[in-house]
């Protein structure tokens, strides 16, 4: 997966928007105003891309033990977020599943009113 594929995959999800809330380097994808995926554009340029994704604590610990490329979230809650390195032992299919899971967790955390508004749009 390259940066363009990541970009298109994330934006293909319902109500997803892109932002640069921290600096011009950190691309953040949000649903309902809440982050579900972050990545550094400079790291993509250097050839060492990674994503920060939300996950369930029990799965995060299991993934970290199972995959060398999955670690506790960098600059994030180490319990609720993971950092996934690209170009390693995580397949593109698995990466998409992790992104989908992150999106789903954040979407479910939105208020019912906001979820209803998103569903109607």
Feature locations, PLM:
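Charge-dense, helix-prone N-terminal extensions
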Residues: 1-121
């Amino acid at each position: 997966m390259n940066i363009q594929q990541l970009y298109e995959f994330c934006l293909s999800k319902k109500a997803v928007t892109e932002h640069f809330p921290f600096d011009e380097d950190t691309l953040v994808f949000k649903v309902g105003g809440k982050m579900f995926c972050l990545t550094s554009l400079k790291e993509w340029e250097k050839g060492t891309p990674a994503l920060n994704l939300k996950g369930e604590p029990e799965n995060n610990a299991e993934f970290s033990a199972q995959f060398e490329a999955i670690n506790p979230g960098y600059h994030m809650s180490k319990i609720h977020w993971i950092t996934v390195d690209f170009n390693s032992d995580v397949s593109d299919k698995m990466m998409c599943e992790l992104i989908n899971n992150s999106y789903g967790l954040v979407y479910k955390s939105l208020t019912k009113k906001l979820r209803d508004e998103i569903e109607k749009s």
